[in-house]
Amino acid sequence: MAFDFPDQFRFADSHEYVRQEAELVRVGLSAYAVDQLGDIVFVDLPEVGDDLSRGTSFGTVESVKAVEEMYAPITGKVIQRNEAVLANPEELQNDPHGEGWLLVIRPSELAQIEELMDSATYSAKVAAA
């Protein structure tokens, strides 16, 4: 299956994406990862105000196939979480790159974004998987 990964996104090896929005960053799970999970039934996210460290678990996503941890693609503080996804996990499945976003983070270091894969690199990675 071919996926369309937005050019303005950057991706972590663990399939989370970031989209910079001024001094904040929106975080979500890539369409590829969501597709691999199948029907999503539960999402667990950190609280607003929590500090995240790049590479550490910040929550889980549960599907009919598996429970997977999600990892912070950058270090920062949670400013907002998507309550709609928590209430209705199908939102993540229906529109992972849009309304299915997970968190808004105030990054500690914006430079960490540049260390993530661009959409072309990520697309090649998942195509080879």
Swiss-Prot record:
Gene3D superfamilies: 2.40.50.100. Transmembrane segments: none annotated. Binds 1 lipoyl cofactor covalently. GO terms for cellular component: cytosol; glycine cleavage complex. The modification N6-lipoyllysine is found at K65. Its cofactor is (R)-lipoate. CDD domains: GCS_H. Residues 24-106 form the Lipoyl-binding domain. The keyword Glycoprotein does not apply. GO terms for biological process: glycine decarboxylation via glycine cleavage system. Keywords: Lipoyl. HAMAP family: GcvH (MF_00272). The glycine cleavage system is composed of four proteins: P, T, L and H. Belongs to the GcvH family. PANTHER family: GLYCINE CLEAVAGE SYSTEM H PROTEIN (PTHR11715), GLYCINE CLEAVAGE SYSTEM H PROTEIN-RELATED (PTHR11715:SF3). The glycine cleavage system catalyzes the degradation of glycine. The H protein shuttles the methylamine group of glycine from the P protein to the T protein. This is Glycine cleavage system H protein. It comes from Synechococcus sp. (strain CC9311). The gene is gcvH.
